[in-house]
Regions:
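Catalytic nucleophile-loop/oxyanion-hole region of alpha/beta-hydrolase
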Residues: 120-122, 127-128, 141-181, 318-325
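N-terminal cap/lid segment of alpha/beta-hydrolase-fold proteins
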Residues: 37-102
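Mobile cap/lid helix-loop segments that gate and shape the active-site cleft of serine hydrolases
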Residues: 72-82, 213, 229-264, 270, ...
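Active-site glycine-rich loops that stabilize anionic/oxyanionic intermediates
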Residues: 112-117, 278
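Primarily recognizes the serine-hydrolase "nucleophile elbow" in alpha/beta-hydrolase
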Residues: 165-238, 256
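Short beta-strand/loop motif that positions the catalytic acidic residue
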Residues: 274-276, 280
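Short beta-strand element of the alpha/beta-hydrolase
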Residues: 105-113
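C-terminal catalytic histidine-bearing segment of alpha/beta-hydrolase fold enzymes
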Residues: 275, 285-343
C-alpha cells in the first residue's frame, strides 16, 4: 500500500543522499516530452477585467524596452472543459486577481510554471480557484511575468524583478482587496517554484532604482508554498530546460550558484511548504529535498509532503485517484497555521 511521506522540521540525515543515490542507480534523467500543437486563443473576459499592471505609465519595467513580438496566448487542449493555455512574450507584466466572496484575509501571489519558456494559465492558475478561492477564502494574484530568454534588458533577473514588484504592489494595496498585509504568501509551481523560492531568498536584492513609493514597500513574502519546484541549477537534479532559458547554453559555475535558491537560504527566509511527487522525472524530487535541507540547516520552519505518484505538473486536476489530491487541503491548513508565525 502506498503511503504519502510527510516531513516536518525533524532531522532527516539520510533522506537526501539516499534518494539521490536511488536516482543515480535507476539511471533516470529529466524527460522532455514533445511539444503538443497549440493554436491562438485569448484570456477570458474575467481575466482581462481582473488585470492589474505591475508598473505605472507605459507598463514597462524600469530600464526595459518593448519587444518586437507581441504577447500571445495559445491553447494546447482540444477539450473545452479542460483548457491548457499558456502565454509568452509578456512585455508589460501584470497580475490577474481572483477574489473570494468571503475573504479570510490571506493572499497568495501565484507564479505558474512553464520552464521559463512560457507561463501556463490554467492547471497552475485558473484551476486553483475552486479550492483556494471559493472554498478556502484566499485571494489569489496570478502573475504574468516576463520570461528571461526573450530579450529583456534585465535578462535573468526580469522574472524576479516582476515578482518583487508584484509582492510589493499587493502589500501596498492590501486594504483595497481585503487582504491582511502580514498574511501575503507566494505559491510557485515548477519553474514558477524556482521564481517563488528566488523571491523568498532574494526579496531584498536591489534590481533597479526605485520608481515610486511602491518600490520601497517590503517584498518579503510572509510564507511560501513550492509545488514540484525547480531549485538547483548546479547538479544532476537540474531541470536543463529551465536553466537554459534562465542562464543560456553554457553558464558559468558562479552564475549557476547565484541562481540556485538553496544557496541563499537564511534564518529570515519565510516559512515554507513543499509538495513533490517521488516519481517526477522532469523536475526530480531532489530539488525539494535540497531546499528542505537548506531550510532545516538555517532553522526555517518547513513542512514537506512527498507523494509516491503524480509525476510532474499535476496541479490540482491531475491528482484524481492519487494521494497527491490531498495537497490543496494540507496547504490551506498550513496557510491558516501561519497566523501564529511571526514575520
Amino acid at each position: 500500500m502506498h503511503r504519502r511521506l510527510a516531513v516536518s522540521a525533524r532531522p532527516a540525515r539520510c533522506l537526501i543522499p539516499c534518494l539521490a543515490s536511488l536516482w543515480l542507480i535507476a539511471g533516470l534523467s529529466p524527460a522532455h516530452a514533445a511539444e503538443p500543437p497549440a493554436w491562438p486563443t485569448t484570456e477570458t473576459a474575467a481575466e482581462q477585467a481582473g488585470r492589474i499592471p505591475l508598473w505605472p505609465g507605459d507598463g514597462l519595467a524600469p530600464g526595459d524596452h518593448a519587444l518586437a513580438q507581441p504577447q500571445r496566448t495559445l491553447e494546447r487542449s482540444p477539450d473545452p472543459a479542460l483548457p491548457d493555455r499558456f502565454v509568452d512574450h509578456v512585455n508589460r507584466p501584470y497580475l490577474v486577481v481572483q477574489r473570494p466572496a468571503h475573504p479570510n484575509g490571506a493572499a497568495l501571489l501565484v507564479i505558474p510554471g512553464g520552464g521559463y519558456a512560457r507561463i501556463v494559465l490554467d492547471k497552475e492558475g485558473s484551476a486553483l480557484v475552486p479550492s483556494f478561492v471559493e472554498q478556502g477564502g484566499v485571494t489569489l494574484f496570478v502573475l504574468r511575468y516576463r520570461l528571461p530568454g526573450e530579450g529583456h534588458a534585465d535578462g535573468a533577473d526580469a522574472p524576479l524583478a516582476d515578482a518583487q514588484r508584484a509582492l510589493r504592489l499587493i502589500r501596498a494595496r492590501a486594504n483595497e482587496w481585503g487582504v491582511d498585509p502580514h498574511r501575503i504568501g507566494v505559491m510557485g509551481f515548477s519553474a514558477g517554484g524556482h521564481l517563488a523560492a528566488s523571491l523568498g531568498t532574494r526579496y531584498d536584492q536591489t534590481l533597479h532604482a526605485p520608481r515610486d513609493a511602491i518600490d520601497r514597500v517590503p517584498a518579503r513574502p510572509d510564507f511560501q508554498l513550492l509545488v514540484y519546484p525547480v531549485i538547483d541549477m548546479t547538479g544532476i537534479a537540474t531541470h536543463a530546460g529551465s536553466r537554459q532559458q534562465l542562464l543560456g547554453d553554457a553558464p558559468r559555475a558562479d552564475r549557476m550558484q547565484q541562481y540556485s535558491p538553496q544557496q541563499h537560504v537564511t534564518a529570515a527566509t519565510p516559512p515554507t511548504f513543499l509538495v513533490h511527487a517521488q516519481d517526477d522525472t522532469v523536475v526530480p524530487v531532489e530539488n525539494s529535498l535540497l531546499f528542505y535541507g537548506a531550510l532545516r540547516a538555517a532553522g526555517v520552519p518547513v513542512e514537506m509532503h512527498l507523494f509516491p505518484r503524480g509525476g510532474h505538473g499535476f496541479g490540482i486536476r491531475g491528482t484524481v485517484g492519487l494521494t497527491a489530491a490531498a495537497w490543496p487541503r494540507l496547504a490551506l491548513a498550513w496557510i491558516d497555521a501561519q497566523r501564529e508565525v511571526s514575520p
